[in-house]
Curated annotation (Swiss-Prot):
<feature type="compositionally biased region" description="Low complexity">
    <location>
        <begin position="129"/>
        <end position="140"/>
    </location>
</feature>
<feature type="compositionally biased region" description="Low complexity">
    <location>
        <begin position="113"/>
        <end position="122"/>
    </location>
</feature>
<feature type="compositionally biased region" description="Low complexity">
    <location>
        <begin position="717"/>
        <end position="726"/>
    </location>
</feature>
<feature type="compositionally biased region" description="Gly residues">
    <location>
        <begin position="147"/>
        <end position="161"/>
    </location>
</feature>
<feature type="compositionally biased region" description="Low complexity">
    <location>
        <begin position="574"/>
        <end position="584"/>
    </location>
</feature>
<feature type="compositionally biased region" description="Low complexity">
    <location>
        <begin position="214"/>
        <end position="223"/>
    </location>
</feature>
<feature type="compositionally biased region" description="Pro residues">
    <location>
        <begin position="13"/>
        <end position="33"/>
    </location>
</feature>
<feature type="compositionally biased region" description="Low complexity">
    <location>
        <begin position="390"/>
        <end position="402"/>
    </location>
</feature>
<feature type="compositionally biased region" description="Low complexity">
    <location>
        <begin position="512"/>
        <end position="542"/>
    </location>
</feature>
<feature type="compositionally biased region" description="Gly residues">
    <location>
        <begin position="285"/>
        <end position="297"/>
    </location>
</feature>
<feature type="compositionally biased region" description="Pro residues">
    <location>
        <begin position="821"/>
        <end position="836"/>
    </location>
</feature>
<feature type="compositionally biased region" description="Low complexity">
    <location>
        <begin position="425"/>
        <end position="444"/>
    </location>
</feature>
<dbReference type="Pfam" id="PF01391">
    <property type="entry name" value="Collagen"/>
</dbReference>
<feature type="compositionally biased region" description="Low complexity">
    <location>
        <begin position="792"/>
        <end position="812"/>
    </location>
</feature>
<feature type="compositionally biased region" description="Gly residues">
    <location>
        <begin position="185"/>
        <end position="194"/>
    </location>
</feature>
<feature type="compositionally biased region" description="Basic and acidic residues">
    <location>
        <begin position="757"/>
        <end position="771"/>
    </location>
</feature>
<feature type="compositionally biased region" description="Gly residues">
    <location>
        <begin position="564"/>
        <end position="573"/>
    </location>
</feature>
Amino acid sequence: QMSYVDHSKSSGPPQPGPMGPMGPRGPPGPPGSSGPQGFTGPPGEPGEPGASGAMGSRGPSGPPGKNGDDGEPGKGAAGPQGARGFSGLDGAKGDAGPAGPKGESGAPGENGVPGVMGARGRPGPPGPSGARGNDGNTGPXGPPGPTGGETGPAGGRGNEGPQGARGEPGNPGPAGPAGPAGSPGTDGGPGAKGSPGAAGLAGAPGFPGGPAGAQGAVGAPGPKGNSGDPGASGPKGEPGAKGEPGPAGVQGLPGPSGEEGKRGARGEPGGAGPRGPPGERGFPGADGGAGGKGAPGERGAPGSLGAQGATGESGSPGAPGAPGSKGVTGSPGSPGPDGKTGPAGVAGQDGRPGPPGSAGARGQPGVMGFPGPKGPAGESGKPGERDGDVGAPGPSGVAGPAGEKGDRGFPGERGAPGLGGPTGARGAPGPAGNDGAKGEPGAAGAPGGLGAPGMQGMPGERGASGLPGAKGERGDAGGKGGDGAPGKDGSRGMTGALGVPGPPGAQGEKVAGPTGPRGETGPPGPAGFAGPPGADGQPGAKGETGDSGPKGDAGPQGPAGPTGPKGGAGPPGATGFPGPAGRVGPPGPAGAAGPPGPVGPVGKGETGXAGRPGPQGLAGQRGLVGLPGQRGERGFSGLPGPSGEPGKQGASGPVGERGPPGPSGPPGLSGATGEAGREGSQGHDGAPGRDGSAGPKGDRGESGMAGPPGPPGAPGAPGAVGPSGKSGDRGETGPAGPAGPSGPAGVRGPAGPAGAKGDRGEAGEAGDRGHKGFTGMQGLPGPAGVHGERGPAGASGPAGPRGPAGSNGAPGKDNGEMGPAGPPGPPGPAGPPGPPGSGFDFVSQPLQEKAPDPFRGGHYLRSPDGTQKKALLLGGSNDVELR
């Protein structure tokens, strides 16, 4: 409903009535006069180029402008600079490109430092003694002594007759049972970890994109078309080259223990491998138990008479004989001349070696070997998948200063931000400007930088031990045992006739005999001559600086000096750097809207001069958060970020559990029997004594000293390698290692180039300033624009530094079961004869904990004169080095 005011019935100037509703649009009136030119506001900051949105529909026509007076077209004051808009959401994640070419394998790393020699294990307990052999048969009685002599008084006891000759040796007794195997020694500690190998070579870079197209000319703006349907997705771009793996992140906490793996099927035994090179000579192992009695070998040719055996046990005393007549004690005869030494008997041929004995007890663990060469570096792993969501955008950055408006040019690439110019002088305050429009919400800031790496986590608790594995299959039966221990020597038999000399026997094996008694100390040598005078000594070391003396007492305070003249004013100081910008204060409360003023008469003034630009209006209050805008086009891929600092060395993992014992090796071949020692010369028979009555049983004589050992024979050739034993069941799978840390977030790429600025349209007629309308409802977001074609893949960035070595994985669970022992190998051929001995006794020196040399004990050679020389067994040979 319209209301009218009749001015004819009122006096005075006409008063404005209330504003009526909007009428229908009338025909366009004549062009009005231009209004006064407004102040030119500062140019706004160029905004980020947005994505091309769909063309909007045409809005409804606005109300017609009120006819104004004839004036020049005015120019409204430019509004204040709007706040920066929100950054668009991240585009959809592109498809991952195929894996790049495989990098070449890295060069093999250097050998690690040799590990510390492990301590020698404790020797096993000795086996039980063998059963005693059967007693030898008593030899035949000696010939009776000559009778005669004067009859002595009754009841007297005759002198003891000469001892009968020794009977023949008895047959050897049965071998005693084998002693139990000694307990295995403790394993040596693990060697030091080798240094990591060199990093592999970087992969080949990807193929570069095509050449850049020529710059197109700027076309004339065409008319706006209707909104087209979204086009189909463009063809998928070529995948980019595989990037180098990023540096390793901070070590993550150890993951939970994995489930116990299923037991794998038993593997098939492998074929016999090629014969390996002879290993280094190890330390002598512990004595094995006595083996079972072997099958009797073929009887060899009669050998020469052996050395005199140990004295047998005396027989039980016989019944006392009848007392004989007392004989006359004859004078002792002079000792006869020494007999000539008989020809040495030729040693008989060695018998065939018996069947190999059963495997002996497990020897002590050998000295820990040097760690082998490090294998070649493994292939580079594929880059891990990105773990974790994209972080929220960081706070908004500070807006830069507004730039001046330039001429319209071709859209160029966005340049790097320039350095800030010096601060200009403060201008004169301009006239107060109009209230600025409400500012738009500020743009979201760039994402914050990557946080510092967290503290290294504590190592997790050790997992519980797994269940014991299933019992392994029963091993194959062992081979036949070796020859049993020889029985005790029987009584000495009568001397046999000298046999026919046999053919020369093969050189026997060198066996170390027992240590002979130490010789007596020789007489002291003559005194030496006086030596020449010694050379002049070196100058003594420089003396140390003495301690500083005690601090002296402070002297008395002096009198105060006269006051000096007052100084003049100094030169003015240099202009300081401008201080940092203060914090923006909180926005003040919005003022209350004043009542609308009366509409004044339309003025018709002359065009005034352009006034000074007014100060920038205060920033409006923050508006409501808008709905998310349409998804922008995907920006260019950012350059590769700088390589992160290499991570710190992770804590060493726990020591792994002890591995399963290896299978027993095939038993060694028994060496050839050494030659018997040379028979001693037979003494002359003494004069037969008188036949006396049997005397009391004499005490057992002391055993004679052992003769010198024969020269050691050359060792036999090593036997052929037996077939490898069946491989043991596969051990249970250890728990999975901890998951690696996620890589650092990528650096945000640079913004796309700014679009060309459109031509400024002509200013319309200035209408009356209406009342401020209510805030309209927020429009719905437009449809999403079509993604542009994917650009060519950029070249690969430089390879990042190699990350530190990861920590050791968690130890595996139970040990695998031990496989059965392989069958013994065939006996090897007899070795060639060895060189003659050097006159040294081979002595084994026990281990010493604190020895002056790294060998900590070993073997010594002792010469007949009592001196000792250390014998070092050179690896891979039987040479002996004397020290």
